[in-house]
């Protein structure tokens, strides 16, 4: 007796979602809030970011990265853009543990919004660990809409095959596994396969629009992430005046340790394990990692979508580097490998701060920019975004998808 009404109710919900319109009304206030929410939902879900990035009256720019976006202070890019009413607003896309593979699949949800646009992309050398990042971290930021968006847009090329292979490695029980395996094996998808993908892609897109209208999680973050700092900054823009203000804030908030870290971070993340952390990173290397191949996925997408990115390479807090025993020569060799992969293919807009980790108040903690680091970031990024230019011609090299490159630790100029 109960089964019939439940079945009918389920069918009605399915039909409601399937025929729900995908376009959302633009609301600048809501879009500004979602842009700085820095929640898991704002990172991986489609509707809020697509709505903002397609707003004809405000230019939201994707800022891709990981957890650095959560380090807010008076010089944070979202704060400066709002305070000085710049021609753009950052849309912050990143979470702790996310790296290029998550970013690539997230991009599949918003390809029309990336076409011929500028973006900011932070590349942290810490991403390039021996085994890449944990499958659990990847899965946390992946969803069915990303999957069907990828399957719908894939072209059967080497990038698609590599992405499918990595997806199976990171998510062995992924939905539609048989289709992903076909791509990984370079098998052609059948007409029936493509029809199913299209049907599920439409459903996922409409489901995202339907539930996205109720998504307010993280909206309150706008006040504590942005509004609270606006009144601390001078009304007239001046780098020197802003530097004086954020430097005073940094001095006040790095007073309980000798490592130049924010007090709260030091108290909660470092202090209790300080002795154990001494020389704990002596054996770390970032030279051999699948992340180099994952990065190539992103570069391939940028080339296909004619995106003009600026890449940011952050430093490690120098005091922390020395204390933890992280080798400076290895770090710089990693940076050179990353830069070679970028520059040799035509991605030449790079702000390399990798040698600035010893500058006072440049870092918020061990590896994240803050205060004067954000100001240096702004001096590189704001002129780039305020004077938009088309993407240059890229010259992609598929060798960067190879295991040879992922594990190469020699002179980059000698790589064949």
Language-model regions: role of each:
Residues 65-66, 122-126, 264-273, 312-317, ...:
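Short loop/turn segments at strand-loop or loop-helix junctions that form parts
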Residues 30, 150-294, 398-416:
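Secreted/periplasmic serine-hydrolase-like ester/acetyl group-modifying domain
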Residues 69-159:
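Membrane-embedded segments
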């Amino acid at each position: 007796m109960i089964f019939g009404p439940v079945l009918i109710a389920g069918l009605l919900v399915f039909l409601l979602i399937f025929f729900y319109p995908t376009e959302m009304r633009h609301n600048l206030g809501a879009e500004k809030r979602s842009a700085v929410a820095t929640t898991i939902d704002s990172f991986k879900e489609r509707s809020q970011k697509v709505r903002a990035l397609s707003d004809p009256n405000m230019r939201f720019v994707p800022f891709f990265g990981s957890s650095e976006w959560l380090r807010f202070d008076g010089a944070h890019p979202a704060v400066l853009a709002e305070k000085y009413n710049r021609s753009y607003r950052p849309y912050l896309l990143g979470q702790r543990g996310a790296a290029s593979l998550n970013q690539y699949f997230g991009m599949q949800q918003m390809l029309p919004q990336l076409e011929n646009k500028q973006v900011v992309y932070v590349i942290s050398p810490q991403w390039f660990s021996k085994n890449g990042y944990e499958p659990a971290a990847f899965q946390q930021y992946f969803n069915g809409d990303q999957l069907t968006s990828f399957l719908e847009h894939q072209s059967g090329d080497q990038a698609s095959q590599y992405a499918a292979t990595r997806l199976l490695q990171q998510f062995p029980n992924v939905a539609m596994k048989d289709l992903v395996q076909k791509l990984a094996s370079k098998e052609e998808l059948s007409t029936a396969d493509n029809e199913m993908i299209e049907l599920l892609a439409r459903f996922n897109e409409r489901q995202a629009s339907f539930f996205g209208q109720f998504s307010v999680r993280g909206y309150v973050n706008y006040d504590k992430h942005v509004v609270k700092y606006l009144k601390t900054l001078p009304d007239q823009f001046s780098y020197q005046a802003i530097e004086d203000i954020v430097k005073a804030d940094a001095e006040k908030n790095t007073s309980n340790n000798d490592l130049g870290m924010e007090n709260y971070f030091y108290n909660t993340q470092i202090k209790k394990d300080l002795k154990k952390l001494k020389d704990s990173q002596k054996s770390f290397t970032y030279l051999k990692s699948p992340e180099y191949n994952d990065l190539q996925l992103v570069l391939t997408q940028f080339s296909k979508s004619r995106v003009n990115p600026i890449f940011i390479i952050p430093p490690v807090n120098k005091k922390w580097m020395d204390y933890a025993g992280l080798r400076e020569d290895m770090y710089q060799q990693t940076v050179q490998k990353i830069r070679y992969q970028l520059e040799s293919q035509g991605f030449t807009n790079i702000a390399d701060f990798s040698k600035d980790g010893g500058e006072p108040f440049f870092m918020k903690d061990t590896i994240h920019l803050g205060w004067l680091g954000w100001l240096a970031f702004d001096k590189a990024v704001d002129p780039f975004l305020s004077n938009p230019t088309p993407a240059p011609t890229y010259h992609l090299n598929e060798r960067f998808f190879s295991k040879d490159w992922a594990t190469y630790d020699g002179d980059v100029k000698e790589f064949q």
